[in-house]
Each structure stands twice: as C-alpha cells, then as structure tokens.
Amino acid sequence: MAKEIAKSLLDIEAVTLSPNDLYTWSSGIKSPIYCDNRVTLGYPLVRGAIRDGLINLIKEHFPEVEVISGTATAGIPHAAFIAEKLKLPMNYVRSSNKSHGKQNQIEGAKSEGKKVVVIEDLISTGGSSVTAVEALKLAGAEVLGVVAIFTYGLKKADDTFSNIQLPFYTLSDYSELIEVAENEGKISSEDIQTLVEWRDNLA
C-alpha cells in the first residue's frame, strides 16, 4: 500500500521533488520536496484509495473509534470521506478559535466523552496534530491517535508524538516515496543522496 500511495502522489503531482532547485515552505525551510495533498481531491480513484487505506489503519489500530476528526483545512475532506464510509459522526478542528460567533475551535460532532481519531493530510513536525489533539482533549475527548496520508519521517515528528504519548500511522512516507521516484526514473541515484541528507539534517 505504501508504494502504491507514493506512486499515486507522484503521478498526480500532489508530491513533487526538486533536489537541485529547493522549494521554500511557509516556515522558511528550504526543501527539495513539496507536498500538497489537496491535489488528491481532483482524482476520485486516488482519493478513494486514500480513504480506504486510512480506514484500514483505523480499523487495525483504533477499532473502538466513535468520532472522526479532521484538521483544518486539508484534513477535513478526507475525514468526511472516512466518516461517511464508516457511518460515524465527524467534526473538524481549527488551528485556533474563531474570532466571531461562538468562537468555536471545534465544529461538528460533540467530542466530550467520545473516542476520537484525528485525520491529517500530512505530518511534518507534528505541530498541527498536537494543536488539534489538545483542543479535542480540552473538549473532553479521548483521543486515540492520528492517521495521515504522508509523513516526511522527521525525528521531530516522532519526538512530538512521543511527548504527548500518542500513536500516529501514515499510508506512505518519505523513504518509500523517494524509492518509488527513483524506480520510476523521476530522480537519479545522486538525487537520492541529496534527498536523504536533507531529511537527516533536518531531523
């Protein structure tokens, strides 16, 4: 599954690699990889495979789940697809409270006393996941864990989740993706070294 998802992300250019002309993330980090999983929404077969893959992760690791929660904004549609398929309540978590109305940070199904799984599109450092998890816990939820489409495999993410003692699982990761990219002829063996060094240095 990991390689199939990685291939799909590369094929539809949801993930692009540029070892010699780095992208700049919003955080200012210079990176040879850019991931925009919102692109998957335009490809029904890909988004369906992602939905089913994430459902399999949930059934395997969190079978007692009662509420599906998406992180705003990119996690929301995938959470909706999953909740619909599983016939479960759903909500989503903003990065901060609204500045108007009821000033809610969580919209949708009530979380209090419920076992919740958080849906992310991408895990880089794990920061946005922690924000969502903390908001849900504050609302009285029992957060079981996080599932996501893709992770860069950074040590910082492992440390972040370890610090809050919460498991996370992804459909594919950076190592799988660059291996698939090399096999597909999208990058050279020299590029592989550059990509691995970037990840290790950033970690």
From Swiss-Prot:
It comes from the Bacteria. GO terms for molecular function: magnesium ion binding; orotate phosphoribosyltransferase activity. Pathway: Pyrimidine metabolism; UMP biosynthesis via de novo pathway; UMP from orotate: step 1/2. PROSITE patterns: PUR_PYR_PR_TRANSFER. It catalyses: orotidine 5'-phosphate + diphosphate = orotate + 5-phospho-alpha-D-ribose 1-diphosphate. GO terms for biological process: 'de novo' UMP biosynthetic process; pyrimidine nucleobase biosynthetic process. CDD domains: PRTases_typeI (cd06223). Its cofactor is Mg(2+). Pfam families: Pribosyltran. Its EC number is 2.4.2.10. 5-phospho-alpha-D-ribose 1-diphosphate binds at R94, K98, H100, E120, D121, L122, I123, S124, T125, G126, G127, S128. It is an enzyme of class 2 (transferase). The keyword Magnesium applies. Orotate binds at S124. Catalyzes the transfer of a ribosyl phosphate group from 5-phosphoribose 1-diphosphate to orotate, leading to the formation of orotidine monophosphate (OMP). Homodimer. NCBIfam families: pyrE. This is Orotate phosphoribosyltransferase. It comes from Staphylococcus aureus (strain MSSA476). The lineage of its organism: Bacteria, Bacillati, Bacillota, Bacilli, Bacillales.
